[in-house]
């Protein structure tokens, strides 16, 4: 991967700048129109990676209006951030990653009414690794289960854009800026800047997300797959459902037939015996 061409200066040097979000307009004025989308960018910091049991310790959401043709940011419509006291000790290793200590969250509580107001206004919710953030939000806020979630890791083809990693920090550096990562609002602002970055002359990444939010996704379940095929399934990007004991992956409609043939040849001994089912737009990343 090379940095975007605008960064390269004489003597093969790269110029990076620190981004703190101040260049994003903080207008609380609705400039949306029939040709724009209201998008909620969301980020969480948590006590750990266990989606079913760990707790949120910081949340940031920002509602923005985006032009559906250009991907330009029309306005910041609303925003909210807060710590949340998990009422349990934050592990020191977690604090080393996000810088959040027990003292910082002590006594704080998220105003879920404020979060709900923002999410309810949004046409779609974007998170970097949406499957992680959504799992927590679905536990805490019922309206999360009704919204369309889209993932800036999986729903932007970063590789075709010339980037060999989808990690947010790396993508931002390759676009010429760095930021105070692993703090919720800093991550949100940096993601907005990345998705609407002016270096994208043809199609900004945020437009990929808007487009993919309306494209149906299909789940292929390799039920009753032989145990000895687990490694080849894993190497072909299948995930293991530990509760129901089967391998699965999500695909677009144009990928289904070739995947069925692959499963027939490599897993089922010549005949496809899996299950294909359409995922509703609001169930994506559940």
Language-model segment annotations:
Residues 1-30, 197-286:
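Acidic two-metal-ion nuclease catalytic site recognized across multiple nuclease folds
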Residues 146-156:
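Short, acidic/small-residue loops that bind anionic groups at enzyme active sites
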Residues 2-148, 161, 165-181:
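Conserved non-catalytic scaffold segment of RNase H-like nuclease domains
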Residues 131-133, 155, 225:
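Short, solvent-exposed loop/turn segments at secondary-structure junctions
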Residues 186-195:
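Acidic, divalent-metal-coordinating active-site segment for phosphoryl/phosphodiester hydrolysis
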Residues 140, 158, 174, 194-201:
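Active-site catalytic microenvironments for nucleophilic, acid-base chemistry
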């Amino acid at each position: 991967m090379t940095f975007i061409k605008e960064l390269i200066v004489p003597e093969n040097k790269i110029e990076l700048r620190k981004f703190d979000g101040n260049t994003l307009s903080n207008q609380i004025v609705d400039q949306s129109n029939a040709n724009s989308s209201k998008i909620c960018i969301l980020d969480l910091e948590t006590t750990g990676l266990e989606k079913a049991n760990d707790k949120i310790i910081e949340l940031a959401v920002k509602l923005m209006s985006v032009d559906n043709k250009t991907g330009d940011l029309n306005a910041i419509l609303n925003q909210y951030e807060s710590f949340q006291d998990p009422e349990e000790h934050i592990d020191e290793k977690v604090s080393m990653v996000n810088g959040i200590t027990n003292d910082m969250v002590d006594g704080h509580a998220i105003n879920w009414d404020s979060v709900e107001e923002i999410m309810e206004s949004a046409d779609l919710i974007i998170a970097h690794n949406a499957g992680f953030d959504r799992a927590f939000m679905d536990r805490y806020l019922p309206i999360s289960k009704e919204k369309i979630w889209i993932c800036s890791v999986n729903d932007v083809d970063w590789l075709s854009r010339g980037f060999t990693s989808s990690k947010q920090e790396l993508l931002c550096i390759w676009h010429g800026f760095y930021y105070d990562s692993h703090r919720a609002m800093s991550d949100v602002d940096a993601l907005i800047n990345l998705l609407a970055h002016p270096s994208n002359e043809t199609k900004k990444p945020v437009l990929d997300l808007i487009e993919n939010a309306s494209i149906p996704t299909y789940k292929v379940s390799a039920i009753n797959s032989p145990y000895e095929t687990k490694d080849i399934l894993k190497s072909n990007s299948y995930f293991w459902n530990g509760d129901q004991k089967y391998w699965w992956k999500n695909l677009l409609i144009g990928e289904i037939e070739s995947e069925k043939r692959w499963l027939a040849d490599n897993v089922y001994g010549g005949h496809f015996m899996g299950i294909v089912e359409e995922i509703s737009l609001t169930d994506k990343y559940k």
